[in-house]
Structure formats: structure tokens, C-alpha cells
Design a protein with these regions (language model features):
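Generic structural detector for well-ordered beta-strands
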Residues: 207, 217-219, 262-264
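A glycine-anchored, Pro-Gly-centered beta-turn/N-cap motif
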Residues: 214, 220-228, 232
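Bacterial N-terminal signal peptides that target proteins for export
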Residues: 1-11
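Primarily secretory-pathway and cell-envelope proteins
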Residues: 25-189, 234-270
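Extended, solvent-exposed segments with strong compositional bias
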Residues: 182-213
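Short, solvent-exposed loop/turn positions at domain surfaces
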Residues: 130-132, 204, 218
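Bacterial N-terminal signal peptides
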Residues: 9-20
């Protein structure tokens, strides 16, 4: 009798163990491997997730002395308003992929390759269309919870969130930041572009507290003046190299420059 009880107990224990392992595997499988970055506004009444926006990228020959100096450049405002056709950039014209390089070499001979390697340097400007954000805050001291731990193709330890002030350009768009790069940088798949080494932006002094891998609490150190702002994700190292192709396509580490959460501090904010 005791032997039968022991056998039954062993069978139950084995079944529980198998079920436990299977349940754990099922839970792991149900959990998404990738998750797009999120920014949540945290306040006394609860929390509100801000909509994630995609930046537009424009080109100009003007040097980026400041965002204010670029705000009057029609090439910048027109480029951001029209938006960049990322698909066209990936397929046409600026051929620097393996296939494109072969086509250029066959059609343009060695001279064409030499000229291609001497592309002039231009200024790339990131911005968002429209003169104002639809996310209007009534507080001058917002608190945000930022999570990009599951961002696809991104090492979260390489990035941290920031708050930047946006610059209104000709009442048509808001400028986020700018940097220098080769004219064909957006078509390069190789990670050879130090985007952030000379990046121009109006960063706000902020309290940045890491709560986990790719997870942060973020708030300004001082009350914000009324105006246009954004939460952005930036490389911790200014020498981090990026693929211009990834930036154009909004994928991998390049996605971090293409992603923004805008907000407006109202005139009557407290």
C-alpha cells in the first residue's frame, strides 16, 4: 500500500514539474522579444503614455552654428515639411550598397568611384512637422518614465534619455537637432558615421535616474519655461558610430535618432 502511495506521489510530483517547466516556457514565449520604446508622463492622478513620433530628416549646405541659425533656412523647413522618402533613399540614386557600388563601377569606371569617395559634407537636420505639439502639459516640472529595454536591434546600455528644447522654424516645423555628414551618408550601411560627436541641440539640464537596463526616470532639474520640448534618446558615447542607412530606415540603433516624444509646456503651466 505504501509503495503504491509513493509511486502516486512521485507521478504527481513529476507531472507538476513537467507542467511547471512547460508553463514557464509558454509564459516566456508569450512575452514579446522586442518592444518599441515608450515614454510615460507620471503624475499624481496616474500616468499617461505619450505618443511616439517619427522625426523627419532634411539636408542643407548651411553649417549648424545653432538651431536658431538653421530655422530661417528654407531648405530645412521644406525638407522637414515634405518629409524624407526613406524607401526612395534605400532604392535609388545614392548607390553605396554592394549592388549599387557594382553598378556605379561598371557605368562610371574608376573615375566615378574616385568622385564618389569625395562627397561634400552637408548638414543634416532632424525635426518634426507643425508649429506645436498636441501634448500640452500644465506642469513646469514633468516627470517621465522611459523604457527602451526591448528596442529591436539596440543595445540599451549604449543610450540614455534626454530632454531637449525645440526651435520653431518659420512657423511650419520644430527643429530637434543637427549634425554634419557626407552628402551620401544616408545610403551607407556601414556603421561609420559619428552622428553625435558634433551634434547641435538645446539640451535641458535633467535628472536622469537609471532604474533598470534601458529603463529610466527623467525630469528637468529646474522648472521649464513655456514652449516646445521633447524627450529623446541619445548615445552615451559621443563617438558612437551609426549606419546612415539604419537612420534613414529607422531601424536598429539608427531608430534612436528617428524617435521622439514631443510636448508643450503651456503658458499657464504651474
Amino acid at each position: 500500500m505504501k509503495s503504491s502511495v509513493w509511486k502516486l506521489a512521485a507521478m504527481v510530483s513529476l507531472a507538476v514539474g513537467v507542467c511547471g517547466g512547460a508553463c514557464a516556457q509558454a509564459q516566456q514565449a508569450a512575452k514579446p522579444r522586442w518592444q518599441m520604446p515608450t515614454v510615460t508622463l507620471v503624475h499624481d492622478a496616474g500616468s499617461q503614455e505619450l505618443p511616439r513620433e517619427k522625426t523627419q530628416l532634411a539636408e542643407t549646405k548651411s553649417k549648424p552654428q545653432s538651431l536658431a541659425s538653421l530655422a530661417g533656412d528654407s531648405a530645412v523647413t521644406q525638407g522637414i515639411q515634405a518629409g524624407v522618402n526613406d524607401a526612395a533613399w534605400g532604392v535609388a540614386g545614392h548607390m553605396n550598397s554592394a549592388v549599387g557600388g557594382t553598378a556605379v563601377t561598371q557605368g562610371g569606371s574608376i573615375l566615378g568611384g574616385m568622385l564618389a569617395s569625395r562627397k561634400p559634407t552637408v548638414t543634416y537636420v532632424w525635426g518634426v512637422p507643425g508649429p506645436a505639439s498636441g501634448n500640452i502639459l500644465k506642469t513646469t516640472s514633468p516627470k517621465f518614465s522611459v523604457n527602451f529595454a526591448g528596442a529591436p536591434g539596440v543595445n540599451p546600455s549604449d543610450f540614455a534619455p534626454e530632454i531637449v528644447r525645440l526651435t520653431l522654424a518659420q512657423n511650419t516645423c520644430r527643429l530637434i537637432g543637427a549634425t554634419r555628414g557626407k552628402e551620401d551618408a544616408r545610403s551607407h550601411d556601414a556603421a561609420d558615421w559619428e552622428i553625435y560627436s558634433g551634434f547641435v541641440e538645446d539640451r535641458v539640464a535633467a535628472n536622469v535616474q537609471k532604474t533598470g537596463e534601458g529603463q529610466y526616470d527623467l525630469s528637468p532639474q529646474s522648472p521649464l519655461y513655456p514652449g516646445e520640448y521633447a524627450v529623446v534618446l541619445r548615445p552615451i558615447s559621443k563617438n558612437e558610430k551609426f549606419s546612415g542607412g539604419d537612420v534613414s530606415r529607422g531601424q536598429g540603433a539608427g531608430m534612436m535618432f528617428d524617435t521622439v516624444w514631443t510636448f508643450q509646456v503651456a503658458e499657464n503651466a504651474q
